């Protein structure tokens, strides 16, 4: 367990720590530091194993969860709202309606309509040409730079549209009984997480697969196999809180318990508390100058969790149709 002593979090690990290499100990201690410090690599901790103090085993580690902050945007009553500052600010006006999900940044983004078609979204909120070569999609999310990723309506293919260059990717190891549903890209853009549903003849759950990129950073394909990180079924939303912490939740259904989970991937799952009204979408972005978990409920209220992921929920916006999917 973790104990607090003189404002320093202390823990004692098993003798297995002593059998690790210096590099392995460094990664483990850095992951512990990032996890306990809510992504801060400067958090002071004390890590002991027997009589050995490994508190500084990660001094040479470059692993860092301080990823660039992407401002969180919402779609609210025809307006695109930035939550970057402590007060919601309108940054664009739009005629978007019947929106399933959208992606937005200072350079624009994309919008997925309930009809399944994706249109490019300019920075002023106006919509333009169809994306993904006119293919219908079930979900979209943001990638590196101008990349927009998505899952087609068949649930069998992952697609990426990078400024009009479209690539369709098969997922190695996906069998006929399995389909893809929600998805999210890691902050560095080299991993995709996605939920898998099965008709009963195969495994459901949450998986992560690597993205292969060319020397110029463009997408070349997917790695040879995906790693199943959870066997939780019915997962409809997910987000990378940082490089190492991943969150997901099951589909919201009125009157039924909703399950939220988080884990340091790959690693064991722990429960993630959700607001009392549940969640219909989640994302991670800059709110009030800090990187925060953001959740939208079925009443259109956006809440963020303060401090650690176990902190209290605070209302950030209301009358919201959709969160910008980071």
What role is predicted for each listed range?
Residues 1-326:
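Bimodal "functional hotspot" detector
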